[in-house]
UniProtKB/Swiss-Prot annotation:
GO cellular component assignments: cytosol
Protein's name in the database: Phosphoglycerate kinase
Keyword Hydrolase set for record: no
Record's keyword terms, sorted: ATP-binding, Cytoplasm, Glycolysis, Kinase, Nucleotide-binding, Transferase
Residues annotated as binding ATP: K198, E315, G344, G345, D346, T347
Entries under InterPro entries matching the protein: Phosphoglycerate_kinase, Phosphoglycerate_kinase_CS, Phosphoglycerate_kinase_N, Phosphoglycerate_kinase_sf
Organism: Actinobacillus succinogenes (strain ATCC 55618 / DSM 22257 / CCUG 43843 / 130Z)
Metabolic or biological pathway, per its Swiss-Prot or TrEMBL entry: Carbohydrate degradation; glycolysis; pyruvate from D-glyceraldehyde 3-phosphate: step 2/5
Length: 391
Protein backbone atom coordinates (compact mmCIF):
# COMPACT_ATOMS: atom_id res chain seq x y z
CA UNK A 1 0.00 0.00 0.00
CA UNK A 2 1.81 3.12 -1.15
CA UNK A 3 0.27 5.89 0.94
CA UNK A 4 1.93 8.78 2.76
CA UNK A 5 2.05 8.03 6.49
CA UNK A 6 1.48 10.62 9.19
CA UNK A 7 4.40 9.17 11.16
CA UNK A 8 6.80 10.23 8.35
CA UNK A 9 5.67 13.87 8.11
CA UNK A 10 7.01 17.05 9.71
CA UNK A 11 3.90 18.58 11.28
CA UNK A 12 5.49 21.40 13.32
CA UNK A 13 3.25 24.46 13.17
CA UNK A 14 0.96 22.79 10.62
CA UNK A 15 -2.84 22.75 10.84
CA UNK A 16 -3.69 19.05 10.94
CA UNK A 17 -7.23 17.77 10.29
CA UNK A 18 -7.67 14.21 11.62
CA UNK A 19 -10.70 12.18 10.52
CA UNK A 20 -11.03 9.65 13.33
CA UNK A 21 -13.69 7.09 14.18
CA UNK A 22 -15.19 8.41 17.42
CA UNK A 23 -18.62 6.93 16.70
CA UNK A 24 -19.16 5.59 20.21
CA UNK A 25 -22.34 4.65 22.07
CA UNK A 26 -23.55 7.46 24.34
CA UNK A 27 -25.86 6.95 27.31
CA UNK A 28 -27.22 9.80 29.44
CA UNK A 29 -24.68 12.20 27.91
CA UNK A 30 -21.71 9.96 28.75
CA UNK A 31 -19.57 7.67 26.59
CA UNK A 32 -20.78 4.10 27.18
CA UNK A 33 -17.93 2.25 25.43
CA UNK A 34 -14.59 4.00 24.95
CA UNK A 35 -12.69 1.50 22.75
CA UNK A 36 -12.69 3.69 19.64
CA UNK A 37 -11.62 6.80 21.56
CA UNK A 38 -8.81 4.90 23.29
CA UNK A 39 -7.64 3.65 19.88
CA UNK A 40 -7.48 7.26 18.61
CA UNK A 41 -5.61 8.79 21.57
CA UNK A 42 -2.11 7.69 20.37
CA UNK A 43 -2.76 9.50 17.05
CA UNK A 44 -3.73 12.69 18.90
CA UNK A 45 -0.66 12.42 21.13
CA UNK A 46 1.59 11.91 18.09
CA UNK A 47 0.18 15.04 16.42
CA UNK A 48 0.77 17.04 19.62
CA UNK A 49 4.33 15.69 19.99
CA UNK A 50 5.05 16.74 16.41
CA UNK A 51 3.99 20.31 17.26
CA UNK A 52 0.84 20.34 15.12
CA UNK A 53 -2.24 22.51 15.50
CA UNK A 54 -4.67 19.64 15.99
CA UNK A 55 -8.26 19.36 14.77
CA UNK A 56 -10.10 16.05 14.99
CA UNK A 57 -13.57 15.08 13.83
CA UNK A 58 -15.84 12.08 13.34
CA UNK A 59 -19.41 11.08 12.65
CA UNK A 60 -21.63 10.03 15.54
CA UNK A 61 -24.85 8.11 14.95
CA UNK A 62 -27.14 8.94 12.05
CA UNK A 63 -28.21 12.58 12.32
CA UNK A 64 -30.28 14.37 9.68
CA UNK A 65 -27.96 16.48 7.52
CA UNK A 66 -28.43 20.18 8.10
CA UNK A 67 -30.30 19.70 11.40
CA UNK A 68 -28.23 19.79 14.57
CA UNK A 69 -29.73 18.15 17.66
CA UNK A 70 -27.99 17.96 21.08
CA UNK A 71 -28.01 14.13 21.01
CA UNK A 72 -25.90 14.23 17.80
CA UNK A 73 -23.11 16.20 19.50
CA UNK A 74 -19.54 15.03 20.03
CA UNK A 75 -19.59 16.85 23.42
CA UNK A 76 -19.48 13.53 25.40
CA UNK A 77 -16.31 12.64 23.44
CA UNK A 78 -14.81 16.05 24.31
CA UNK A 79 -15.67 15.50 28.00
CA UNK A 80 -13.99 12.09 27.84
CA UNK A 81 -10.85 13.49 26.17
CA UNK A 82 -10.58 16.26 28.76
CA UNK A 83 -10.28 13.54 31.41
CA UNK A 84 -7.88 11.40 29.40
CA UNK A 85 -4.63 13.00 30.61
CA UNK A 86 -3.66 14.35 27.20
CA UNK A 87 -1.99 17.27 28.96
CA UNK A 88 -3.74 19.86 26.76
CA UNK A 89 -7.23 21.40 26.76
CA UNK A 90 -9.80 19.91 24.37
CA UNK A 91 -12.64 22.09 23.09
CA UNK A 92 -15.59 21.61 20.76
CA UNK A 93 -16.21 23.92 17.79
CA UNK A 94 -19.68 23.74 16.30
CA UNK A 95 -19.50 26.10 13.32
CA UNK A 96 -16.20 25.55 11.58
CA UNK A 97 -16.79 25.41 7.82
CA UNK A 98 -15.68 29.02 7.29
CA UNK A 99 -12.52 28.65 9.38
CA UNK A 100 -11.19 27.58 12.78
CA UNK A 101 -8.79 29.34 15.10
CA UNK A 102 -6.57 26.52 16.38
CA UNK A 103 -3.27 26.83 18.24
CA UNK A 104 -0.45 24.42 19.01
CA UNK A 105 -0.89 22.88 22.46
CA UNK A 106 -4.64 22.32 22.23
CA UNK A 107 -7.04 19.92 20.53
CA UNK A 108 -10.09 21.23 18.73
CA UNK A 109 -12.89 18.74 18.14
CA UNK A 110 -14.98 19.71 15.11
CA UNK A 111 -18.67 18.86 15.58
CA UNK A 112 -20.26 15.73 14.04
CA UNK A 113 -19.49 15.75 10.29
CA UNK A 114 -22.76 14.02 9.45
CA UNK A 115 -24.67 17.15 10.46
CA UNK A 116 -23.04 18.97 7.51
CA UNK A 117 -25.12 19.08 4.32
CA UNK A 118 -23.50 17.06 1.55
CA UNK A 119 -21.30 14.92 3.85
CA UNK A 120 -22.72 11.53 2.91
CA UNK A 121 -22.94 12.14 -0.82
CA UNK A 122 -19.38 13.51 -0.90
CA UNK A 123 -20.30 17.04 -2.05
CA UNK A 124 -17.07 18.48 -3.55
CA UNK A 125 -17.83 21.96 -2.15
CA UNK A 126 -17.95 20.52 1.38
CA UNK A 127 -14.75 18.55 0.73
CA UNK A 128 -13.05 21.80 -0.33
CA UNK A 129 -14.24 23.57 2.84
CA UNK A 130 -12.77 20.82 5.03
CA UNK A 131 -9.53 20.95 3.01
CA UNK A 132 -9.27 24.73 3.44
CA UNK A 133 -9.10 24.25 7.22
CA UNK A 134 -5.81 22.34 7.11
CA UNK A 135 -2.29 21.96 5.79
CA UNK A 136 -2.38 18.18 6.30
CA UNK A 137 -5.37 15.82 6.22
CA UNK A 138 -5.00 12.58 8.22
CA UNK A 139 -7.40 9.72 7.47
CA UNK A 140 -7.43 7.49 10.53
CA UNK A 141 -10.95 6.01 10.45
CA UNK A 142 -10.64 2.54 8.93
CA UNK A 143 -14.25 1.80 9.93
CA UNK A 144 -15.51 4.35 7.37
CA UNK A 145 -12.83 3.79 4.71
CA UNK A 146 -15.31 1.88 2.53
CA UNK A 147 -17.49 4.99 2.21
CA UNK A 148 -16.64 7.86 -0.14
CA UNK A 149 -17.89 10.82 1.88
CA UNK A 150 -16.78 14.43 2.13
CA UNK A 151 -14.78 13.86 5.35
CA UNK A 152 -13.20 10.57 4.18
CA UNK A 153 -12.69 11.15 0.43
CA UNK A 154 -13.50 14.71 -0.69
CA UNK A 155 -11.17 16.38 1.80
CA UNK A 156 -8.36 14.00 0.79
CA UNK A 157 -8.76 15.11 -2.83
CA UNK A 158 -8.32 18.80 -2.05
CA UNK A 159 -6.11 19.03 1.07
CA UNK A 160 -2.51 20.21 0.42
CA UNK A 161 -1.26 16.86 1.84
CA UNK A 162 -3.34 13.72 2.51
CA UNK A 163 -1.95 10.85 4.56
CA UNK A 164 -2.86 7.73 6.55
CA UNK A 165 -2.89 7.94 10.33
CA UNK A 166 -1.24 5.26 12.52
CA UNK A 167 -4.50 3.31 13.04
CA UNK A 168 -5.38 3.16 9.34
CA UNK A 169 -1.78 2.27 8.42
CA UNK A 170 -1.77 -0.54 11.01
CA UNK A 171 -5.08 -1.93 9.67
CA UNK A 172 -3.78 -1.95 6.10
CA UNK A 173 -0.49 -3.58 7.16
CA UNK A 174 -2.24 -6.28 9.23
CA UNK A 175 -4.82 -7.09 6.55
CA UNK A 176 -2.12 -7.08 3.88
CA UNK A 177 -0.06 -9.50 5.97
CA UNK A 178 -3.03 -11.87 6.39
CA UNK A 179 -4.42 -11.72 2.86
CA UNK A 180 -1.61 -10.80 0.49
CA UNK A 181 1.39 -12.59 1.98
CA UNK A 182 0.00 -15.12 4.46
CA UNK A 183 2.22 -17.65 6.16
CA UNK A 184 0.88 -21.08 5.27
CA UNK A 185 -1.26 -22.88 6.15
CA UNK A 186 -3.79 -20.05 6.14
CA UNK A 187 -7.14 -20.57 7.84
CA UNK A 188 -10.25 -18.40 7.56
CA UNK A 189 -13.13 -18.71 10.04
CA UNK A 190 -16.39 -17.17 8.86
CA UNK A 191 -19.44 -17.16 11.11
CA UNK A 192 -22.68 -15.26 11.08
CA UNK A 193 -26.30 -15.97 10.40
CA UNK A 194 -26.52 -15.99 6.62
CA UNK A 195 -24.51 -17.37 3.70
CA UNK A 196 -26.06 -14.68 1.47
CA UNK A 197 -24.42 -11.80 3.38
CA UNK A 198 -21.01 -13.51 3.43
CA UNK A 199 -21.05 -15.27 0.03
CA UNK A 200 -18.57 -12.92 -1.67
CA UNK A 201 -16.34 -13.10 1.43
CA UNK A 202 -16.45 -16.91 1.36
CA UNK A 203 -15.74 -16.89 -2.39
CA UNK A 204 -12.73 -14.57 -2.01
CA UNK A 205 -11.35 -16.51 0.95
CA UNK A 206 -11.80 -19.86 -0.78
CA UNK A 207 -9.22 -18.64 -3.33
CA UNK A 208 -6.68 -17.55 -0.68
CA UNK A 209 -7.14 -19.82 2.34
CA UNK A 210 -5.86 -23.38 2.63
CA UNK A 211 -8.75 -24.16 4.95
CA UNK A 212 -12.15 -22.56 5.59
CA UNK A 213 -14.26 -23.01 8.72
CA UNK A 214 -17.89 -21.87 8.70
CA UNK A 215 -19.98 -21.30 11.82
CA UNK A 216 -23.35 -20.10 13.04
CA UNK A 217 -26.30 -20.02 10.66
CA UNK A 218 -23.87 -20.31 7.74
CA UNK A 219 -22.80 -23.76 8.96
CA UNK A 220 -26.47 -24.84 9.10
CA UNK A 221 -26.75 -24.30 5.34
CA UNK A 222 -23.65 -26.49 4.84
CA UNK A 223 -25.15 -29.16 7.15
CA UNK A 224 -28.36 -29.10 5.08
CA UNK A 225 -26.25 -29.34 1.89
CA UNK A 226 -24.93 -32.68 3.19
CA UNK A 227 -28.52 -33.93 3.34
CA UNK A 228 -29.04 -33.68 7.10
CA UNK A 229 -32.23 -32.44 8.72
CA UNK A 230 -31.66 -29.06 10.41
CA UNK A 231 -35.12 -28.82 12.01
CA UNK A 232 -36.16 -25.23 12.70
CA UNK A 233 -32.59 -23.94 12.41
CA UNK A 234 -31.83 -20.73 10.58
CA UNK A 235 -30.53 -21.74 7.15
CA UNK A 236 -30.93 -20.74 3.49
CA UNK A 237 -32.40 -23.48 1.33
CA UNK A 238 -31.88 -21.54 -1.90
CA UNK A 239 -28.14 -21.33 -1.20
CA UNK A 240 -27.58 -25.08 -0.77
CA UNK A 241 -26.11 -25.31 -4.33
CA UNK A 242 -23.64 -22.52 -3.42
CA UNK A 243 -22.71 -24.34 -0.21
CA UNK A 244 -22.11 -27.54 -2.21
CA UNK A 245 -19.94 -25.64 -4.71
CA UNK A 246 -17.84 -24.04 -1.96
CA UNK A 247 -17.52 -27.32 -0.05
CA UNK A 248 -16.28 -29.04 -3.21
CA UNK A 249 -13.78 -26.26 -3.99
CA UNK A 250 -12.42 -25.77 -0.47
CA UNK A 251 -11.84 -27.97 2.51
CA UNK A 252 -14.77 -27.03 4.79
CA UNK A 253 -15.37 -29.30 7.80
CA UNK A 254 -19.06 -29.77 8.58
CA UNK A 255 -20.02 -30.39 12.26
CA UNK A 256 -20.50 -34.03 13.27
CA UNK A 257 -22.30 -33.10 16.49
CA UNK A 258 -24.34 -30.06 17.54
CA UNK A 259 -26.08 -28.41 20.50
CA UNK A 260 -29.78 -27.88 19.91
CA UNK A 261 -32.65 -26.14 21.68
CA UNK A 262 -36.38 -25.92 21.09
CA UNK A 263 -36.57 -22.15 21.61
CA UNK A 264 -34.31 -19.15 21.05
CA UNK A 265 -33.85 -17.90 24.60
CA UNK A 266 -31.13 -17.48 27.19
CA UNK A 267 -32.72 -20.04 29.48
CA UNK A 268 -33.38 -22.68 26.79
CA UNK A 269 -31.72 -25.98 27.81
CA UNK A 270 -29.11 -27.35 25.40
CA UNK A 271 -29.05 -30.94 24.16
CA UNK A 272 -25.91 -32.29 22.53
CA UNK A 273 -26.46 -34.83 19.75
CA UNK A 274 -25.17 -36.20 16.47
CA UNK A 275 -25.82 -33.97 13.47
CA UNK A 276 -27.84 -36.86 12.00
CA UNK A 277 -30.37 -36.78 14.86
CA UNK A 278 -31.77 -33.23 14.80
CA UNK A 279 -35.56 -33.33 15.25
CA UNK A 280 -38.08 -31.23 13.34
CA UNK A 281 -38.86 -29.10 16.43
CA UNK A 282 -35.20 -28.37 17.27
CA UNK A 283 -32.79 -25.63 16.20
CA UNK A 284 -29.00 -25.85 16.03
CA UNK A 285 -27.48 -23.09 18.21
CA UNK A 286 -23.90 -24.35 18.65
CA UNK A 287 -21.46 -27.05 17.60
CA UNK A 288 -20.90 -30.10 19.82
CA UNK A 289 -17.75 -31.10 21.73
CA UNK A 290 -16.36 -33.44 19.05
CA UNK A 291 -16.76 -30.81 16.34
CA UNK A 292 -15.24 -28.11 18.57
CA UNK A 293 -12.20 -30.30 19.30
CA UNK A 294 -11.81 -31.06 15.59
CA UNK A 295 -11.84 -27.32 14.80
CA UNK A 296 -9.38 -26.61 17.63
CA UNK A 297 -6.93 -29.09 16.05
CA UNK A 298 -7.23 -27.39 12.65
CA UNK A 299 -6.80 -23.94 14.22
CA UNK A 300 -3.69 -24.95 16.18
CA UNK A 301 -1.97 -26.16 13.01
CA UNK A 302 -2.54 -22.86 11.14
CA UNK A 303 0.12 -20.17 10.70
CA UNK A 304 -2.26 -17.37 9.59
CA UNK A 305 -5.79 -17.09 11.00
CA UNK A 306 -8.46 -14.66 9.82
CA UNK A 307 -11.51 -14.72 12.10
CA UNK A 308 -14.87 -13.14 11.36
CA UNK A 309 -17.85 -14.42 13.30
CA UNK A 310 -18.71 -16.86 16.11
CA UNK A 311 -19.62 -20.53 15.61
CA UNK A 312 -22.73 -20.47 17.83
CA UNK A 313 -25.11 -18.29 19.82
CA UNK A 314 -22.35 -17.44 22.33
CA UNK A 315 -24.50 -14.73 23.97
CA UNK A 316 -26.48 -17.57 25.62
CA UNK A 317 -24.41 -19.47 28.24
CA UNK A 318 -25.79 -22.87 27.15
CA UNK A 319 -24.63 -22.34 23.55
CA UNK A 320 -21.31 -20.66 24.26
CA UNK A 321 -18.92 -23.60 24.42
CA UNK A 322 -18.15 -23.96 20.70
CA UNK A 323 -17.12 -20.32 20.31
CA UNK A 324 -15.14 -20.49 23.57
CA UNK A 325 -13.14 -23.54 22.38
CA UNK A 326 -12.49 -21.86 19.00
CA UNK A 327 -11.45 -18.58 20.72
CA UNK A 328 -9.01 -20.33 23.05
CA UNK A 329 -7.55 -22.36 20.18
CA UNK A 330 -6.89 -19.14 18.22
CA UNK A 331 -5.21 -17.63 21.31
CA UNK A 332 -3.06 -20.76 21.71
CA UNK A 333 -2.08 -20.83 18.02
CA UNK A 334 -1.11 -17.14 18.26
CA UNK A 335 1.01 -17.82 21.36
CA UNK A 336 2.80 -20.50 19.31
CA UNK A 337 3.70 -18.08 16.51
CA UNK A 338 0.64 -17.86 14.25
CA UNK A 339 -0.52 -14.45 13.00
CA UNK A 340 -4.20 -13.89 13.88
CA UNK A 341 -6.49 -11.08 12.80
CA UNK A 342 -10.08 -10.71 13.98
CA UNK A 343 -12.83 -8.33 12.87
CA UNK A 344 -16.57 -7.73 13.08
CA UNK A 345 -18.82 -6.71 15.98
CA UNK A 346 -19.85 -10.19 17.15
CA UNK A 347 -16.25 -11.40 16.98
CA UNK A 348 -15.04 -8.49 19.12
CA UNK A 349 -17.82 -9.19 21.64
CA UNK A 350 -16.67 -12.84 21.84
CA UNK A 351 -13.03 -11.73 22.29
CA UNK A 352 -14.10 -9.50 25.20
CA UNK A 353 -16.28 -12.21 26.76
CA UNK A 354 -13.52 -14.84 26.72
CA UNK A 355 -10.78 -12.41 27.77
CA UNK A 356 -8.41 -13.03 24.85
CA UNK A 357 -7.98 -9.43 23.67
CA UNK A 358 -4.22 -9.48 24.30
CA UNK A 359 -3.83 -12.92 22.74
CA UNK A 360 -4.85 -11.99 19.17
CA UNK A 361 -2.18 -10.47 16.89
CA UNK A 362 -4.44 -7.77 15.47
CA UNK A 363 -8.04 -6.76 16.17
CA UNK A 364 -9.62 -4.77 13.34
CA UNK A 365 -11.77 -1.76 14.21
CA UNK A 366 -13.76 -1.88 10.98
CA UNK A 367 -16.88 -3.98 10.42
CA UNK A 368 -18.04 -3.25 6.87
CA UNK A 369 -14.61 -1.98 5.79
CA UNK A 370 -12.96 -5.15 7.14
CA UNK A 371 -15.31 -7.37 5.12
CA UNK A 372 -14.99 -5.29 1.95
CA UNK A 373 -11.20 -5.45 2.17
CA UNK A 374 -11.41 -9.23 2.64
CA UNK A 375 -13.69 -9.42 -0.42
CA UNK A 376 -10.93 -7.75 -2.40
CA UNK A 377 -12.87 -4.53 -2.94
CA UNK A 378 -11.08 -1.21 -3.23
CA UNK A 379 -11.75 1.03 -0.21
CA UNK A 380 -12.43 4.54 -1.61
CA UNK A 381 -10.75 6.40 1.26
CA UNK A 382 -7.60 4.32 0.78
CA UNK A 383 -7.71 4.64 -3.01
CA UNK A 384 -7.69 8.46 -2.83
CA UNK A 385 -4.72 8.39 -0.39
CA UNK A 386 -2.84 6.18 -2.86
CA UNK A 387 -3.69 8.53 -5.73
CA UNK A 388 -2.45 11.53 -3.75
CA UNK A 389 0.74 9.72 -2.70
CA UNK A 390 1.54 8.85 -6.31
CA UNK A 391 0.91 12.33 -7.68
Amino acid sequence: MSVIKMTDLDLAGKRVFIRADLNVPVKDGKVASDARIRATIPTLKLALEKGAKVMVTSHLGRPTEGEFKPEDSLQPVVDYLNNAELGVPVRLVQNYLDGVDVQAGEIVVLENVRVNKGEKKNDPELGKKYAALCDVFVMDAFGTAHRAQASTYGVAEYAPVACAGPLLAAELDALGKALKEPQRPMLAIVGGSKVSTKLTVLDSLSKIADQLIVGGGIANTFIAAEGHNVGKSLYEEDLIPEAKRLAAATNIPVPVDVRVGTEFSESAPATEKSVTEVRADESIFDIGDKSAEELAKIIKSAKTILWNGPVGVFEFPNFRKGTEVVSNAIAEATANGAFSIAGGGDTLAAIDLFGIKDKISYISTGGGAFLEFVEGKVLPAVEILEKRANG
